[in-house]
Amino acid sequence: FDYPMAEGVKKTFRRLYTTNLAKAVSFTLGIEDYTEVLEEFKLIAGDIAKEYGLYPSLQNNDEYKAKEWEIASAKYGDEFSHLQDRAEKLAESETDRATYQAMEALIHNLNTMNSRAGAQNPFSSINYGTDTSPEGRMVIKNVMLAEEHGLGNGETPIFPIHIFKVKEGVNYNPGDP
């Protein structure tokens, strides 16, 4: 469950980072319509991805930001790296919130869905716990938080059944990531 969901989290972070960076640059330089700046940063991101195989990410984003700075600092000035940092922090926060909302929706939908007979909820379970990427860990954290929060009005969700996988070298021993 966590591996495929992490791919969606990566895409969300990339989109939010680029959008937030375009907004930050627009606000700083007094550009009223940020869509042109956004399109420019989308092109820059595409060029960096093609040439270097780098993307904005929750982990080790420094190399991507350095390449982006090389391209954009001439046009946007030395304060550009500060704007990158702000956009990164905001994108991480917004990605975390979007991930929580997605997990909340999953739990809500699984507990309000009826079977074809209309009398029961379909049995569902999810397996997670071995993805050590920041995106995978964000998925795991937020699915557990959404489960803990419940369905509202004090109602505890019955589904999905959570199966947390334990693996040596991943999450079994105290020193594992």
Predicted segment positions?
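Conserved catalytic cores of very large enzyme subunits
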Residues: F1-P177
